[in-house]
């Protein structure tokens, strides 16, 4: 791929429409982020063990037995779980949860996430009245610029590869299946970061850091979604839509960190910047 090819692409794009499309995308992304039970509403991160523990803001004592989360409700406590209204005194055992999966319970308006991350079973309450969510005023971004959009190619591995990466929480690791790499050119340099499977069939995402990380953008990671390659393996890599992961906003997230080859040596002055505040940090 040549620099001239990228310039031809830029010249063919209606810049005003490009900016409008980016603005509409950004507004919708912020709307999803501020959902009353989204990550900005998480009030704590709790790792379950055999030792029962009370969790602030939700009923019961919580523990782990044979890989299953258990909640022990006292007299007068109630919880909605597995389609049932549970009333104490009662012991409820949740089904086993697969890695990166989870189930939800409810206590009034508080949603209770029971999930498995990095081999650990965790509980995270999500309260729509949480102060951090109420005070959130948006994420700063770079202005959209076509110089940070490039055409690239997806190069599939012969077989998908399991890639182990670190996590925002010390001591955790995540294992993701990677179908291949995405190769593209930015400002005369070629990059081939490892890609992972996205939410939509055939789509991809890239975890990365760059020379702006820890300066104007979040230090640990950002993520870029990439639409499914076409029949010839072509993809569009648009860093204007690079976003923060939940760990940029809260200490109660277990987000994955980029593999070493995705630490890009160029400063990508595009996409979301470091959030203004972070939930759970000491003032």
Which residues does each predicted region cover?
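Actinobacteria-biased recognition of intrinsically disordered, low-complexity terminal regions
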Residues: 1-16, 281-283
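N-terminal beta-hairpin/loop module of FHA
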Residues: 30-59
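Forkhead-associated
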Residues: 48-100
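Broad, structure-driven detector of short, well-ordered beta-strand segments within folded domains
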Residues: 59-67, 109-116, 191-195
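Protease-labile, long low-complexity intrinsically disordered regions enriched in Pro/Ser/Thr
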Residues: 78-124, 128
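Surface-exposed beta-loop interaction hotspot
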Residues: 108-178, 185
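Acidic/His-leaning functional-site neighborhoods
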Residues: 183-230, 240
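Extended, aromatic/histidine-rich regions of cofactor-dependent oxidoreductases associated
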Residues: 234-236, 242-283
């Amino acid at each position: 791929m040549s620099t001239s090819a990228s310039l031809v692409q830029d010249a063919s794009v209606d810049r005003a429409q490009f900016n409008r499309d980016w603005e509409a995308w950004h507004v919708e992304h912020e709307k999803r982020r501020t959902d009353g039970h989204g990550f900005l509403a998480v009030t704590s991160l709790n790792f379950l063990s055999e030792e029962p523990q009370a969790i602030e803001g939700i009923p019961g004592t919580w523990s782990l037995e044979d890989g299953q989360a258990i909640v022990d409700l006292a007299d007068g406590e109630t919880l909605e779980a597995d389609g049932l209204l549970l009333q104490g005194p009662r012991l409820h055992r949740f089904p086993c949860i697969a890695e990166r999966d989870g189930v939800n319970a409810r206590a009034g308006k508080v949603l209770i996430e029971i999930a498995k991350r990095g081999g650990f079973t965790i509980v995270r309450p999500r309260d729509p009245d949480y102060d951090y969510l109420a005070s959130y005023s948006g994420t700063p971004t770079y202005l959209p610029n076509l110089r940070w959009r490039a055409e690239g190619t997806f190069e599939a591995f012969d077989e998908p590869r399991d890639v182990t990466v670190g996590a925002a929480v010390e001591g955790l690791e995540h294992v993701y299946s990677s179908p291949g790499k995405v190769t593209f050119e930015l400002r005369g340099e070629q990059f081939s970061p490892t890609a992972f499977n996205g939410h939509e069939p055939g789509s991809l995402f890239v975890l990365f850091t760059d020379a702006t990380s820890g300066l104007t953008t979040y230090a640990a990671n950002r993520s870029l979604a990439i639409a499914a390659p076409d029949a010839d393996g072509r993809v569009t890599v648009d860093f204007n839509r690079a976003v923060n992961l939940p760990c940029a906003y809260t200490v109660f997230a277990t987000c994955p960190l980029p593999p070493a080859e995705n630490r890009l040596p160029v400063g990508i002055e595009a996409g979301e910047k470091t959030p203004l505040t972070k939930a759970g940090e000491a003032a």
